[in-house]
Amino acid sequence: MKRPPNWFDLVKEIIKDFSDLDHQKRSFYGDEFFASSAAEMCAFALDDYTVDEWLETYYDKLPPRLRDDMTEFVEQAMELPGDSAYDTIEDCLYSPEWVKIRALATSLTEQLEHLPDPKES
């Protein structure tokens, strides 16, 4: 699969979406055609040439804290339980796992905001 030309911007947008509770609610309730479940959301975000491969590709060019936080984000996102682990969507969105992933994503969004695209450095 060919990497998207806007790979870095795509990664930033994916992480920003993970930090946004309202976006997640719209996604899960079907108001947006992003994902219909927590599992699909993770699969879309971590699939192909997005977050995990971007991290691997540019790992050595990233500041240490960002590198560590990105690694933790990818690991945590891949371990999120599927929707069947929760009684309701609200239980899912407010579970400790999802609260943690949103906090990580918020921190990453702030760190990535002014970071130049590593490929250009």
Show the residue positions of the predicted features.
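Short terminal alpha-helical segments
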Residues: 1-50
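A generic alpha-helix propensity feature with a strong bias for hydrophobic helices
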Residues: 8, 66, 119-121
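Positions within ordered alpha-helical repeat solenoids
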Residues: 20, 79-82, 111-114
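Short, surface-exposed, charged/polar-biased interaction segments
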Residues: 32-36, 94, 98, 110, ...
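Amphipathic protein-protein interaction modules
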Residues: 50-107
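Structured alpha-helical bundle/scaffold domains in large eukaryotic membrane-trafficking regulators
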Residues: 85, 113-121
